């Protein structure tokens, strides 16, 4: 079956989804969570095959962590589906209503986008998360995962599709692309008359390929080169907490810290404490000359280090003379994802927030809060770094669009 045929079937199934009531979608998602739990042993066995193949290829620890499933993670995926089931349904929400002078009633109403192509790499949880969010918002979803997770993704998709069948919803509403040739992905990205949105999540190469070749609209979930700037007025203990949580709690996450910028006036007090805390968590440090003057046993940082998304226990450090220099550094090397300032100076905090165009800006809070669930969206399909209709963590509302519904009593325009 061609990718165009699969996409057409998904579009037809999306129409069925768009007509489901909120209670029917909630019941469907609850059933999908139960199906994941029922097929848990099958899914974990499939994941073990993917992990074995990845190790044989010499895949790094960060990629292995993103790929790995265990009972706890699988339970977490099922719980996430149940959380999505309980979220308010955005479809049908009236976001604006106005009565015009001629008596017509003008409403803006949320409706599903249609068909969403989700293109991603080694995170099998995305298969379930993306499917749940798209279905809750009344969209069909075409899932194209990476070859590293093909067995895991297939097992998860089959479990979820079984719940669709039981609910008499066409299983094409959740379509997994099993032909992973790049030519097939390219063909999918050309289907502008069928696919309404493509969302790539993964490495820089994948996202560039999608952005350069797609004829459908694309919302990029680009790399997370996230910074913490420790201002001169920062509370040292607070800043160390933000640093350790942001770097070491889950370094493979896109909202983990990659670069630390430290005001010169606090560097002598802050850096030794920070280095001690990070070394306890086995973080490799790389710094500029001013940093190495205080931490002489660390490696030198290069320009490539400051631009890197390590996704590992590695941190680049630079000492800066002032806030403006920190902001210039972030604008040069950052990826518009998430930036953090530790400061007790309200004016500096406001300047930091207003001077950056990043999707998420934090003041005295960990970068790890850059997450849909943590920010009150309930769940997210990813973190958009594209300045379109959605910017930052994308929840259910970002998977809908607003259209006008006009109600009248025979009014005409002369």
From Swiss-Prot:
Annotated function: Catalyzes the NADPH-dependent reduction of L-glutamate 5-phosphate into L-glutamate 5-semialdehyde and phosphate. The product spontaneously undergoes cyclization to form 1-pyrroline-5-carboxylate.
Pathway annotation: Amino-acid biosynthesis; L-proline biosynthesis; L-glutamate 5-semialdehyde from L-glutamate: step 2/2
Annotated family: Belongs to the gamma-glutamyl phosphate reductase family.
Catalysed conversion reaction: L-glutamate 5-semialdehyde + phosphate + NADP(+) = L-glutamyl 5-phosphate + NADPH + H(+)
Leading EC class: oxidoreductase
Any single GO CC term annotated in Swiss-Prot or TrEMBL for this entry: cytoplasm
Protein name stated in the entry: Gamma-glutamyl phosphate reductase
Single annotated GO MF: NADP binding
Alphabetized CDD domains for the sequence: ALDH_F18-19_ProA-GPR
Subcellular localization, as worded in the UniProt entry: Cytoplasm
Signal peptide: none
Enzyme Commission number(s) from the entry: 1.2.1.41
Biological process annotations from GO: L-proline biosynthetic process
InterPro entries: Ald_DH/histidinol_DH, Ald_DH_C, Ald_DH_N, Aldehyde_DH_dom, G-glutamylP_reductase_CS, Glu-5-SA_DH, GPR_dom
A Pfam family hit: Aldedh
Record key words, sorted: Amino-acid biosynthesis, Cytoplasm, NADP, Oxidoreductase, Proline biosynthesis
Major place of residence: cytoplasm
Keyword hit for Iron: no
């Amino acid at each position: 079956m061609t990718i165009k045929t699969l996409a057409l079937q998904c579009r037809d199934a999306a129409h069925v989804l768009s007509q489901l009531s909120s209670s029917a979608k909630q019941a469907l998602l609850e059933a999908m969570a139960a199906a994941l739990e029922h097929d848990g042993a099958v899914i974990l066995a499939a994941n073990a095959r993917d992990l074995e193949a990845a190790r044989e290829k010499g895949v790094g620890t960060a990629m292995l962590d993103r790929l790995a499933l265990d009972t706890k993670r699988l339970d977490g995926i099922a719980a996430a589906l149940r959380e999505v089931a309980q979220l308010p349904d955005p479809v049908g929400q009236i976001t604006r209503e106005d009565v015009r002078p001629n008596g017509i009633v003008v409403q803006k109403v949320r409706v599903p986008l249609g068909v969403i192509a989700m293109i991603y790499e080694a995170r099998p949880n995305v298969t379930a998360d993306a499917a749940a969010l798209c279905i809750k918002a009344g969209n069909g979803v075409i899932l194209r995962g990476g070859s590293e997770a093909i067995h895991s993704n297939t097992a998860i998709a089959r479990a979820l599709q079984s719940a669709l069948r039981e609910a008499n919803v066409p299983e094409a509403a959740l379509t997994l692309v099993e032909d992973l040739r790049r030519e097939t992905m390219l063909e999918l990205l050309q289907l502008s008359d069928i696919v309404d949105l493509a969302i790539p999540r993964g490495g820089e190469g994948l996202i560039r390929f999608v952005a350069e070749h797609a004829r459908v609209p694309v919302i990029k979930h680009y790399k997370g080169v996230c910074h913490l700037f420790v201002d001169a007025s920062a509370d040292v203990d607070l800043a160390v907490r933000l640093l350790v949580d942001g770097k070491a709690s889950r370094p493979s996450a896109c909202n983990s810290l990659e670069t630390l910028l430290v005001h010169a006036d606090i560097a002598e007090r802050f850096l030794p404490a920070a280095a001690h805390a990070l070394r306890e968590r086995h973080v490799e440090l790389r710094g500029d000359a001013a940093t190495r003057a205080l931490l002489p046993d660390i490696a030198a940082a290069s320009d490539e280090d400051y631009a890197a998304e390590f996704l590992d226990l590695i941190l680049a450090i630079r000492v800066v003379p002032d806030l403006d220099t920190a902001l210039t550094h972030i604008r040069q090397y950052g990826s518009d994802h998430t930036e953090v300032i530790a400061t007790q100076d309200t004016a500096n905090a406001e300047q930091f927030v207003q001077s950056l165009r990043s999707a998420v800006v934090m003041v005295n809070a960990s970068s790890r809060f850059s997450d849909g669930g943590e920010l009150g969206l309930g769940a997210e399909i990813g973190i958009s770094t594209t300045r379109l209709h959605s910017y930052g963590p994308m929840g259910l509302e970002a998977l809908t669009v607003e259209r006008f519904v006009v109600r009248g009593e025979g009014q005409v325009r002369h």
